[in-house]
């Protein structure tokens, strides 16, 4: 059955292609949709010069019809008067056709600024589509829906569903993010997850759920079905599907309406091509060579302290065996105790890793020799400007073609990291190939975090390592231009590494199709119990330029990336600060158990209780505030009673203990709430200026001591260690209280400096970790 569908659809594309088109006319769009079983209005296509008979119109039913011009030049018919609603009589339809034949060419020519002459437009008109006027449910917002499919250059085909009609862009801009549009991959989601992706949409609730006493206009499963059928079309004609000749670049229905409980697809457009993408994955064995080499070669090392020499020193200082370091340096016997060789060809063996630090114009000759002489299994190209400075793109292309030719012939070819990268730091590999001097960058020390950082920007990578210097990454990988190895390659490798438990990625852009590989690898990593955090830059409105469809306009590249990564279970950070906080908190919460999304909130300041409650819901999920069990309420009252706070405040969630609460009262409440069976996680927020709490290190001016066992920090440390539930702390204060924050974090508690950040993290954590 499926094969028959694909064959029938392919014939439609082939017919259009033979006429020199890469898009379908609307009658052909109807034919395609009908092939896949969609509900359509009754219609008839009249070739130019043909007018309808009365009997033909009666078969359409109804008193009115819609007449639409059909031309390969005219995609937006309404803009040029190419759509008219008239009575369903032969005379009215003929008059409408005559009117459009006269006026549409003139309007189109005028709108094009004279680029298309009226005679050319008139010649392009192939006929007119006469469609029954569908009487559909009119409920205001939500009456018209949008269903789209498009090929994202990063992720391949994606399906979009949301509000439709003429106000698509307006609604998408003004509705809260996550409530205007659902963006779904064409594969990898169960029926349950497809439905869960539609549930948050404002239009879905309006038409598929009871609304102010009105019964649903359509069953949720009906909308789920049309979305899944579009997913099927996306799979059948995907750029990744080599079994079909065509790729559906774009398919859009706007509007989709509801008639008598069934979806009916009214207006449609489609673009297609023969473009196909081969997703060529690098082998794990080759990537292991670059991350855990047994031998390293270098070129570009001068006797003076240049970039290459700094890299050599960093490699040696990280404990790599000098006897397995080979430097290409004519005229020298040794440098820094490492053997030198006159040329690449003279290297005594094929090294696992070769580091190339020459200028961009010298890269290709060295790469050619490395490849042809088979002297390296992997290469890091540090060269700055490669692929960015004008004239260097051809160098990258030459290197790609060199590798591609070897691989197609089945000959050995190295994998390449870079170019234009800062290098790699590998603890298992015992090397640091970055070119930052030791005195300018203090390597993170202390907690071995099971963390791998993969970043398109080396500077971003080092900045995050500098600010999070309490946690030592297993790997820190600056991928640069992704000339060969990509973000998807690295994630696909790291997901299977037992020493890696958290993967943090900074992404500016994916190579074509690599976003899909990244998405799949992220899903597998998360299913295996790992955590993945992503900060994605490049958020300009990519798809908002003039385009043939609304789908590309409202579902730009960043929106697609964010939506799919969230569905994979990735923690998507909106800010750099969130990115840092998420990494820190994930490391410190390792081993805590996630049971649900019920949270307990506590603060000694009323404003924080309000702000925390404001952040319970987001597009990544929601937290609920359970009522405390009676025994919990009793324990809280007992903790507050000695200070008389029980007479000032009722016990509810969030709990405001007031600035009067001392260390014992505050932490007694924390302990009671965290022990409650109704609570799955907790935010402990403290404004530390109150004299009632010990929040400062010892000094002559006061008697406080944050290091004491009975202090706030001492008590929280004990509570945190004894509970399996995730708990995060917020200290909303300035540098005076940095010692308190540092002490808490050294003892394993994740600390935030704003309560909204703390709640936002816990919301993402409790929702995404359960996937």
Across the structure, where does each feature detected by a protein language model lie?
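Catalytic-core regions of core metabolic enzymes
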Residues: 1-771
